[in-house]
Amino acid sequence: MDNPSSDPLPSTLSGEEEKPLALLPPVPRGRRGRPPGGATTSNRTLKSSLPRKRGRPPRSEQETPLTAPVDSGGSSDLLLIDDQGVPYTVPEGSAADGPQGSGSKRAPHFCPVCLRAFPYLSDLERHSISHSELKPHVCKDCGKTFKRSSHLRRHCNIHAGLRPFRCVLCPRRFREAGELAHHHRIHSGERPYQCPSCRVRFTEANTLRRHYKRKHPELVGMPVRLCPPNPRTQPLWDDDEGIPVQEGVQEESPEGKEPTWPISSTTSPLSGFTAGGSAGAGRGQEGQDTLVSGGIPTMEGDQKQGPKPLGPGAIGHPPVD
């Protein structure tokens, strides 16, 4: 047998060896031994052509959504799978509108009762309990059933006697944060419920509903909504009816006490002193006695008369000889 090593090389290789190798011109070195910018560009091109590390495909190969064309009567749709493994279809033009998981890409699930849309099927199943009589959450202490787990936790606080929410202004405690927020309106004076007819504000929604029945029967059944706070200074309110108290009206004084009057630095309502400070009665028109009280002259013939100055004959003493 012939030795395979003794076979002559192909003519192509022998021809290539006969050609002289072209020597590249020396590349000038830059400062600190770095080549000029042209060599750096070639190195970058070389790095991009090298194969990447194992387990890391190039970026062009990384496709985030798993897509597949779906034939839907002539219109091309895409079948996408979200991060939870739920498939959904979207039009082909809307696949590049936003990032994955956006509301425009995910096909909503509609409730057949109220036509409310949900992004996930699990949300729709949780919502469907509100339209049924199913109450899967049962209290272990009393056996009462609830539709939501949050309602069961709130009910369990009654058996445990827990009131974790405490008011910072008074020692009262509450089971829920909503009850504490409602209680804060008592301290702040906020009245977020306003009557649309007479513009009267109330603290509670039930008080506004009672106001509808008493004052505006045509508004009974109207939904009660929160209104924005009034930027103007709110007047005083009656606690029961919510009727604003008229300012400037004198309130009834308690029994046995004189009503309070505003006292200024120049006038006094106690006696008939003039603005100059002299006591006694002055002389008005037509010779009638007038009394200056608070800077306002009062005639004797009027219904409202001020206190008259006492003369020497008004004192009940025996006459002096």
From Swiss-Prot:
Compositional bias segments (type: Polar residues): 1-14, 39-48, 262-271
Signal peptide: none
Gene Ontology cellular-component annotations: nucleus
Entry keywords, A to Z: DNA-binding, Metal-binding, Nucleus, Repeat, Transcription, Transcription regulation, Zinc, Zinc-finger
PROSITE patterns attached to this UniProt entry: ZINC_FINGER_C2H2_1, ZINC_FINGER_C2H2_2
DNA-binding region boundaries: 49-59
UniProt-annotated location(s): Nucleus
Keyword hit for DNA-binding: yes
Similarity comment: Belongs to the krueppel C2H2-type zinc-finger protein family.
Protein name per the record: Zinc finger protein 524
Function: May be involved in transcriptional regulation.
Pfam families the record matches: zf-C2H2
Gene: Znf524
Zn finger residue spans: C2H2-type: 109-131, 137-159, 165-187, 193-216
Biased composition (Gly residues): 274-285
Keyword Transcription: yes
Disordered as annotated region, ranges: 1-80, 86-105, 248-321
GO-annotated molecular function: sequence-specific double-stranded DNA binding; zinc ion binding
